[in-house]
């Protein structure tokens, strides 16, 4: 149970492993996930480390696996493993490399063959369409001249005047071009050839598949008639520039028909070959999909092990690997057992050796968590990772955080919706975890599902205390107020009811108030009262002050446990005690006055109740001559004066005494060190040849050096300034933090008012509509009301209350005892590496 409230006790050990057993031992520690390795090669470049070649081989295997994953994407479903395979031995890497490289080579060859076949299929398909279109065009060859003259082709307007032997020399080029380039192609062709060409094109009916990008492309078939070799060269250059594919097209119709038949035969053969190639490729992908996840885990584990081995020192002479590890003391037995398993797996005869190392380096902070407490621990760590072995605020945050959130968010209707959402995530967490989405917003909500669960439960509780459910009160037990006695004694009558705009119930009249308060929460009659806000504001404001001061005092008390654990007696006397005196004499007394007034002033004497605010102000001014504000109790002046004097005394108590005591202690240690040095010098002069004297000389010198080091670290000015900052921060912080807790009242008021406005402006208007239109309209209005409730009151207001609760815990609560300057324990864990949650 100790580890729940304080971080785990850690141990730094030096680990000696035989070279042959190092890999297996590190792998077993990775499976265990309880050891953090220190990098002993910080000054060595990553490319100069011992196992850099093995890491590169693993990265090469990862590249092959990424290639296989890309090939399988959207085609083959990878078979996930329920249980992670064990880390492969180093000799198994060669087998894995052979299998993956062979599979990669076969798949690349299949892809290249398939791409080449599809390219041939594309070209033959284009040629097929081209031959069909040119055949259709040449069938109208007899009317070609008429077509020329009907087109706006001024360069060939004199074609009828040209002799027959000249017209017979017209040449043509046929090809295929992308449809989006057709307009530019036609325009450039016209300008460069100055209109001395005849262009005719036709759109291909079906889209074609690009063999490289595998995207569908739309193409056009064109045929260009020209006269002369120069025009032919220009047209070919333009076609090359626009990446148009030019195909040979024979002039005789018989040859074109024969060529078309040949193309159709080749296409049929090509389709058969492509089908066989695709079947072979699918078989390769199926083989890869069956083992891909297992291969990936094995490669990642091997790579992680070699990364850890690169952080170790290797003693070539002794043939051993030296590592330094942090681990929890409570898990030492499990770690030794894992090392023994690694030794047995490797077949080594030398057992691993663990020796404890003393270090001045602060150990890492390790707080054990589960899926319930992890969210609360993350809230604490987001502010700062706790110092080693200091009090962990997370166990207290489990209760205080959702409670303070609920104080601001208190509405049992909204809390129920939040509770149902959290329960849905919790009940379906296995299915939702298996989806492994990258949506950060969803992951944030899902990882905080237990936090949302508690926030919903506490919101229902505070909502029942406020008697607030979607801005309406619940009359469960019946009101403790009655109107009839006001009429019986004649206070109210018909004339009063006609003349008065508001009527006020007088609890001093017998029977108006039954004397027994509402069994749980606030009486529902306050929801009808016009002075509801006045009553609730007073109640919530005082409640916020009480909760805030109680939490701050609790934080100061927790600092006592830190001082006791670290044996800081000086801090207990000179820091904790004056801090408690200051906060209790001032703000603890304020809580006492609030509760005292609640208990001692009932409805019969409430008219003469004094003002707590005026009493609290006069307390600091030592002003007790105000006769208009009666004292709360006897001897109030003496008690309050004593409290103020004690609070004033506690300030120099915190500020001055500790720095001077530390300076006196430092001077005393320096004086003792100088005396030891003098005695050692006299002994050396008496017998300089004695071995014991030389040993004493070394001991005294070491002691003096250590004290000198300590003396250099001590600086009275720094200590005094630090203590002054702490004192000022604490004294002013108590005042500002108490005021900061009033956000509990402000946020609760804002939430209640927004909820009431939403009900009045939206839902109430739908409920007041009568007739058939009202029946239909209420469904529409309820949908609008539900959407606005979720969007504004649950998400926006919920996020606002969440952030304010964070602020109250991080600043107002944790600064009383929590240092938070540690660093997180980051164990070498295969589970974290495979999940992608490993710390860098």
Curated annotation (Swiss-Prot):
Function in brief: Subunit of the V0 complex of vacuolar(H+)-ATPase (V-ATPase), a multisubunit enzyme composed of a peripheral complex (V1) that hydrolyzes ATP and a membrane integral complex (V0) that translocates protons. V-ATPase is responsible for acidifying and maintaining the pH of intracellular compartments and in some cell types, is targeted to the plasma membrane, where it is responsible for acidifying the extracellular environment. Involved in normal vectorial acid transport into the urine by the kidney.
Principal cellular location given in the protein's record: membrane
Keywords: Cell membrane, Disease variant, Hydrogen ion transport, Ion transport, Membrane, Transmembrane, Transmembrane helix, Transport
One GO CC term on file: phagocytic vesicle membrane
Top-rank taxon, per record: Eukaryota
Impact upon substituting residue 524 to L: In DRTA3; uncertain significance
Listed Pfam families: V_ATPase_I (PF01496)
Segments crossing the lipid bilayer: 391-409, 412-428, 444-473, 539-558, 577-597, 643-662, 728-752, 774-812
GO biological process, one term: proton transmembrane transport
Residues of the signal peptide: none
Stretches of the chain forming a coiled coil according to its record: none
Membrane-topology annotation of the record: Multi-pass membrane protein
Membrane topology (Cytoplasmic): 1-390, 429-443, 559-576, 663-727, 813-840
Gene Ontology molecular function: any one: proton-transporting ATPase activity, rotational mechanism
Protein name from the UniProt record: V-type proton ATPase 116 kDa subunit a 4
Region (Disordered): 675-704
Source species taxonomy: Eukaryota, Metazoa, Chordata, Craniata, Vertebrata
Keyword Membrane: yes
PANTHER family: V-TYPE PROTON ATPASE 116 KDA SUBUNIT A 4, VACUOLAR PROTON ATPASES
